[in-house]
């Protein structure tokens, strides 16, 4: 059964493989993000127009944090104007999913494989809090795993996780550092 917000999945089973011993395999079509390292501790995804902090909260604290502490972390980055911006926030579930790709490999704080671009710093957490709260039960918030690609609802106060912060990029404000000094061609 397909869920509306999941990518189209095609199942390849024993009929195609001809081996009754093999399990079915899911093949998911995905559009890879187009990441650019901005050289200031951030990475821009030019497909989604999001800018991400290159490392996550684990790199800052060396321990997991609650959902409320994740919001405090965003506020701290905004107060410091990290990379010159004061609009850092928790990502939504779809934004968090946009970093995930089985074709990408990085490693978390324990050396386990996570499926995000290797442009992001290694040694961070394997999952992230999102800003999304559970409808009708707001003690829970959604968390996304970069190991499995699954999301789960967790208690905001009793569960410890990590957070990858993001911000929206206004199309005119962002350009790679190398392009800033180039002249545009005029006829």
Language model regions located:
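Extracellular adhesion/carbohydrate-recognition regions
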Residues: 3-88, 162-166, 173-187
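Short, flexible loop/turn elements at secondary-structure junctions
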Residues: 56, 94-95, 133, 167-169
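An exposed tryptophan-centered "aromatic clamp" motif
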Residues: 71-89, 93-143, 154
């Amino acid at each position: 059964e397909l869920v509306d917000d999941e990518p189209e999945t095609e199942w390849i089973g024993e009929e195609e493989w001809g081996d009754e011993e093999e399990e079915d395999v899911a093949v998911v079509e995905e559009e890879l993000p187009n990441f650019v390292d901005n050289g200031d501790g951030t990475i821009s995804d030019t497909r989604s127009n999001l800018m991400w902090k290159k490392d996550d909260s684990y790199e800052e604290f060396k321990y997991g944090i609650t959902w409320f502490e994740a919001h405090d972390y965003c506020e701290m980055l905004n107060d410091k104007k990290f990379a010159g911006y004061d609009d850092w926030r928790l990502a939504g579930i779809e934004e968090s999913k946009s970093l995930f790709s089985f074709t990408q490999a990085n490693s978390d704080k324990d050396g386990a494989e996570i499926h995000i671009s290797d442009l992001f710093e290694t040694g961070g957490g394997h999952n992230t809090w999102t800003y999304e709260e559970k409808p009708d039960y707001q003690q829970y918030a959604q968390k996304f795993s970069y190991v499995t690609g699954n999301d789960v609802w967790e208690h905001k106060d009793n569960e410890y996780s990590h957070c990858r912060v993001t911000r929206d990029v206004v199309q005119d404000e962002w350009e790679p550092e190398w392009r800033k000094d180039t002249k545009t061609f005029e006829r």
